[in-house]
Regions:
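Short, charged, solvent-exposed linker or helix-capping segments at domain edges/interfaces
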Residues: 49-50, 92-94, 167-170
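Catalytic core of non-heme Fe(II) oxygenases with the double-stranded beta-helix
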Residues: 55, 62-132
Length: 173
């Protein structure tokens, strides 16, 4: 399994986006295209993570403004994304073909990027604002715009480096 939609409803909390911590992408015509993570201060309590697991997660704010290349994440093994804005994009997961040639972009650590020719499409989903999904970000995935509207995706991310997707999923069963 690559992802799981949680059947929960959370009101969008009052939050403040802080300093940008990490970005992946390129500048085109003096505009950054890609995704970035920022510090996040949530002014309201979000009761999503069970108490005994809270220390396994860190909170950040994800923003993306373009197609996101197929990649596996650097760092986190699983994330819980609480989508704020989605802009009609699909999150597509892939299986890796034999003899694939992954590569890394600047500031990737253990994650990799893949060419589409090296991948086989697997499952996908289209998130709506307010949706909460668990993602196995150790698996290759991309974000694909489904129309030509401007992309301004936003999500509150609960990320873990210490728990697997299956362990996170079990927290909600």
């Amino acid at each position: 399994m690559y992802f799981k939609k949680l059947n929960i409803k959370i009101d969008i909390p009052d939050y403040e986006v802080g300093e940008k911590q990490l970005e992946y992408g390129i500048n085109i015509d003096d505009k950054f295209n890609g995704l970035w993570y920022s510090d996040l201060k949530v002014n309201d309590q979000i009761d999503l993570i069970p108490e005994k697991y809270k220390s396994d997660f860190y909170l950040s704010f994800l923003e993306a403004n373009s197609f996101i290349l197929p990649h596996s994440d650097s760092g986190p093994t699983a994330v819980i994304n609480f989508y704020i804005e989605t802009n009609n994009c699909a999150t597509q997961f892939y299986e890796i073909k034999n003899n694939a040639k992954p590569y890394q972009i600047k500031n990737q650590t253990d994650g990799c990027v893949y060419n589409l020719d090296d991948l086989i499409e697997a499952e996908s989903f289209i998130a709506e604002p307010g949706d909460v999904y668990i993602l196995d970000v150790s698996k290759v995935h991309s974000v694909i715009p489904l129309d030509n509207t401007e992309i301004n995706r936003k999500a509150i991310c609960f990320s873990t480096n210490s728990l697997s997707f299956n362990q996170v999923e079990m927290m909600f069963t």
